[in-house]
C-alpha cells in the first residue's frame, strides 16, 4: 500500500472539514508523517488524568490536543481565505513549492 503524502507543514493554518470539531480553524503544532496525523492547536481536545509525581506535585486532569487524521483537515489559503486543495509546482530553479488550487497563489 502506497503511503499518502502529507503536504501540510508545521505552523500552517488549517480548517477541520470532518469530525466533532468540523468548521474550526487552527495552527498545526506537529506532523506525524508515518501515521498521517496532525496535532492542531485547540482541536480534538482530550482529558488526561495524571498522578502526582516529582514534576507535577498536585496531579489532576489535564486537557490537551490529540492527533487528528490528515484527511479531516484542509489548508487555508492566505489570499482567498478558504480551505483549498494543494497543488505542487516546480519553479525554474528546480524547487518544488505548494500552490493554492483555486487562486494559484504560492504558499511556500
From Swiss-Prot:
Keyword set, alphabetical order: Ribonucleoprotein, Ribosomal protein, RNA-binding, rRNA-binding
Stored CDD domains: KOW_RPL26 (cd06089)
GO molecular function: rRNA binding; structural constituent of ribosome
InterPro entries xref list: KOW, Rib_uL2_dom2, Ribosomal_uL24, Ribosomal_uL24_CS, Ribosomal_uL24_KOW, Translation_prot_SH3-like_sf
GO annotation, biological process: translation
Pfam families (UniProt xref): KOW (PF00467), ribosomal_L24 (PF17136)
Disulfide linkage: none
One CC-aspect GO term: ribosome
Function of the protein: One of two assembly initiator proteins, it binds directly to the 5'-end of the 23S rRNA, where it nucleates assembly of the 50S subunit. One of the proteins that surrounds the polypeptide exit tunnel on the outside of the subunit.
Similarity section: Belongs to the universal ribosomal protein uL24 family.
Subunit and interaction comment: Part of the 50S ribosomal subunit.
NCBIfam families: rplX_bact
Protein name: Large ribosomal subunit protein uL24
Native source species: Desulfosudis oleivorans (strain DSM 6200 / JCM 39069 / Hxd3) (Desulfococcus oleovorans)
Classification of source organism: Bacteria, Pseudomonadati, Thermodesulfobacteriota, Desulfobacteria, Desulfobacterales
Amino acid at each position: 500500500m502506497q503511503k499518502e503524502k502529507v503536504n501540510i507543514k508545521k505552523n500552517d493554518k488549517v480548517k477541520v472539514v470532518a469530525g466533532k470539531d468540523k468548521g474550526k480553524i487552527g495552527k498545526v503544532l506537529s506532523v506525524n508523517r508515518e501515521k498521517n496525523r496532525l496535532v492542531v492547536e485547540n482541536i480534538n481536545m482530550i482529558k488526561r488524568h495524571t498522578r502526582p509525581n516529582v514534576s507535577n506535585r498536585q496531579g489532576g486532569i489535564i486537557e490537551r490536543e490529540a492527533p487528528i487524521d490528515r484527511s479531516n483537515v484542509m489548508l487555508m489559503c492566505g489570499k482567498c481565505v478558504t480551505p483549498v486543495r494543494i497543488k505542487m509546482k516546480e519553479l525554474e530553479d528546480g524547487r518544488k513549492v505548494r500552490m493554492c488550487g483555486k487562486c494559484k497563489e504560492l504558499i511556500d
